[in-house]
Amino acid sequence: MVPGEGILADATPQLANAIAAQLAARGIPFNEHAIYSTPALLAESRDVIADWSRHGWHGVDMETAATFAVAKHFGARRAAALLRVDDLVSEEHSIADGLHGDHRRFMRDREREVMHAVIEAAAETP
């Protein structure tokens, strides 16, 4: 599937833009890309990963698309700020190896910073 085909479980642009602005204001690097949704945790073979990467998807996630689809159905605002824990394409920082020491602390701190940015963005966006 190519991004944009099928059912589009997209973010509310105003909320997504507000989150991006909050992240930028805090100096938190971010990227905005399409995410591939899968119904099975850790079920992607190397071939599946290569295929979705080749088609422009920049990550994989289980929950976001379902949450967005339900929110969209009910007319609710929706956006996500996902933290990349590992890179399935280049296989760097594999979650299978676990997070250790400084990397674990960094991820915990970054998670907290992103959460505050999202809360602030949601509070300021109608």
What does each model-found stretch correspond to?
Residues 1-126:
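Glycine-rich phosphate- or other oxyanion-binding loops that anchor nucleotides, phosphorylated ligands
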